[in-house]
């Protein structure tokens, strides 16, 4: 996959979901030629603490870590950025890098929809839902999340490092 094939989406703070003021979400359509190798590819590029499952059907975000999702089965409609965000159709082979603070919610999916999720250098991650009492800490956390050292698909030469800065 060529770097120019990525898509980026920027989200503003919506009052509930802070989103990320520094980095856009990055979509890699069809990046996984062999979706069964997704977890291995992420691990080789030091995106670890991986899991395989679906995506929650409520708005949520992680304030203390970026996250990558690789679609390994099925397809889904996922809204990123909170209630007024953007709904994106994802399918087998697609990869999405979600910056810390960016909300995501599964709106609909095929019955076989599965993703692999992972975090740069296996960073621990919290789960936030946009409650008022979590907002101040979440915003402080987002400001302090380090840049990943590698792109989850392409390693040290990947487009994530160009888009988010080195």
What is the meaning of each model-derived region?
Residues 107-166:
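Double-stranded beta-helix
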Residues 81-85:
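Short alpha-helix capping/helix-loop boundary micro-motifs
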Residues 90-110, 119:
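Conserved metal-binding segment of the jelly-roll/cupin
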Residues 62-79, 97:
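Short, conserved beta-strand element in jelly-roll/cupin
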Residues 1-59, 161-166:
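A short, N-terminal "cap"/entry segment at the start of jelly-roll beta-barrel domains
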Residues 18, 60-62, 68-70, 88, ...:
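Short, conserved, surface-exposed binding loops centered on an aromatic residue
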């Amino acid at each position: 996959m060529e770097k120019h094939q990525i898509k980026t989406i920027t989200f503003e703070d919506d009052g509930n979901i802070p989103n990320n003021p520094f980095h856009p979400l990055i979509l890699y359509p069809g990046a996984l030629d062999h979706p069964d190798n997704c977890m291995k590819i992420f691990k080789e590029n030091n995106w670890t603490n991986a899991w395989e499952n679906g995506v929650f059907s409520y708005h949520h975000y992680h304030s203390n870590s970026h996250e990558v999702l690789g679609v390994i089965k099925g397809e889904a409609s996922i809204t990123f950025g909170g209630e007024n965000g953007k709904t994106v159709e994802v399918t087998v082979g697609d990869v999405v890098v979600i910056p810390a603070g960016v909300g995501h919610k599964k709106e609909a999916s095929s019955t076989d929809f599965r993703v692999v999720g992972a975090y740069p250098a296996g960073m621990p991650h919290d789960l936030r839902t946009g409650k008022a009492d979590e907002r101040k800490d979440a915003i402080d956390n987002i400001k302090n999340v380090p840049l990943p050292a590698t792109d989850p698909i392409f390693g040290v030469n990947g487009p994530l490092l160009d888009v988010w800065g080195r």
